[in-house]
Amino acid sequence: MPRFAANLSMMFTEVPFIERFAAARKAGFDAVEFLFPYNYSTLQIQKQLEQNHLTLALFNTAPGDINAGEWGLSALPGREHEAHADIDLALEYALALNCEQVHVMAGVVPAGEDAERYRAVFIDNIRYAADRFAPHGKRILVEALSPGVKPHYLFSSQYQALAIVEEVARDNVFIQLDTFHAQKVDGNLTHLIRDYAGKYAHVQIAGLPDRHEPDDGEINYPWLFRLFDEVGYQGWIGCEYKPRGLTEEGLGWFDAWR
C-alpha cells in the first residue's frame, strides 16, 4: 500500500509554513516533505513533527542564491567548500529531525560551460555527502529535473541520474524518482519503475502537464501506485504538486489512502 507525504512547500500554502504540519495531519497524511528547512530552527520543526505525529520523509540541501539563478551548489566548480558546508548543515537537520534521507541539489550549468566538468565536481561532492551520512545510516538522493522546470540543470534524464549513482559507487546513494519530470523527459514510467526498482529510494508525483493533483492529466497514477506495490517499493511517495485551488478541496484522489 503506498505511503504518501505531503509536500509543505507546495501544498497547504493557504496557511504559513509552520502551520502546514497540522493541516497535513488533519488531512490524513502520516509524513511530510519540503524543499528547505533552513529558515527555521530544528527545534521549531521538531516541535511540529512531534505535536502532529508526522515523519519527515525528505528535504533538500540549500539552493544557493536563487535570485542569481542558482539551484544547488554541489556541481559548481570552485564552490566545493560551500557545497560541503551545505551538506554538513543538512546532516545536522537530518539528525535532529530523524529524517532518513536528503536530496543533494546539483546546480545549473551556465551556457557555454563544460557540463562534464560540472558533473565531475558533482560526483566528488556526492561521495563526500554519502561518506558523511553513511555512519548515521542515512541516504543521499539525486534527482533529474526536466528542462521546462529548471533549464540547464546538470541532468534531466533518469538515465543520467542512474549513471551518476553507478559512478559514485556508494551503497547509500539512490535516485529520487519524480514521475512528473521522468514522464516529461524519458517517458515509459512502467519500465523505469519495474526495471530500476531498488535504485530509487523516494518517489514524487504530480499531474502532467500542469503539475496539479495526480488525478489530473496524462499519467495514470492508480496504475503506478499498484506498480510500486508490485515491485515492493517501501518508501514514501511525496506529493510535490501545485493544487488547482484550495489544497483540501483537491484531495479526493487521496481518499482511498487516508
UniProtKB/Swiss-Prot annotation:
InterPro entries: HPT_OtnI_isomerases, HyI-like, Sugar_Epim/Isomerase, Xyl_isomerase-like_sf, Xyl_isomerase-like_TIM-brl. The keyword Magnesium applies. Its EC number is 5.3.1.35. Keywords: Carbohydrate metabolism, Isomerase, Magnesium, Metal-binding. The active site is at E143, E240. GO terms for molecular function: hydroxypyruvate isomerase activity; metal ion binding. It is an enzyme of class 5 (isomerase). Mg(2+) binds at E143, D178, Q204, E240. It holds the Pfam family AP_endonuc_2. One of its GO terms (biological process) is glyoxylate metabolic process. It comes from the Bacteria. Coiled coil: none annotated. Belongs to the hyi family. OtnI subfamily. Catalyzes the isomerization of 2-oxo-tetronate to 3-oxo-tetronate. NCBIfam families: OxoTetrIsom, PRK09989.1. This is 2-oxo-tetronate isomerase. It comes from Escherichia coli (strain K12). The gene is otnI.
